């Protein structure tokens, strides 16, 4: 189960990097609506990553 949380965290981090990269390109093109949308997706996936790290640690302390 620990490995599932690690893979899910890595996947969500990859998605957040992708949306951050898209936000940067929309900022350079001055398309502010798409930039803010991509920043919010980036923040969403970063929060999912932090949550899954917390779940992994919480599961570890529950077993001991």
From Swiss-Prot:
Domain of life, per lineage: Bacteria
Report if keyword Membrane is assigned.
Answer: yes
**Disulfide bonds, paired cysteine numbers:** none
Membrane topology term reads: Multi-pass membrane protein
Q: Its GO CC terms?
A: plasma membrane
* UniProt keyword Transmembrane helix, yes or no: yes
**Cell location:** Cell membrane
- Which keywords, in A-to-Z order, does the entry hold? Cell membrane, Membrane, Transmembrane, Transmembrane helix
Task: Locate the transmembrane regions by residue number.
Answer: 4-24, 35-55
Principal subcellular localisation of the protein: membrane
Identify this protein by name.
Answer: Uncharacterized protein YpmT
């Amino acid at each position: 189960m620990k490995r599932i949380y690690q893979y899910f965290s890595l996947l969500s981090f990859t998605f957040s990097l992708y949306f951050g990269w898209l936000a940067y390109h929309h900022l350079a093109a001055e398309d502010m609506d798409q930039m803010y949308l991509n920043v919010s997706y980036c923040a969403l996936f970063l929060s999912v990553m932090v949550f899954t790290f917390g779940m992994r640690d919480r599961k570890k302390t529950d077993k001991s």
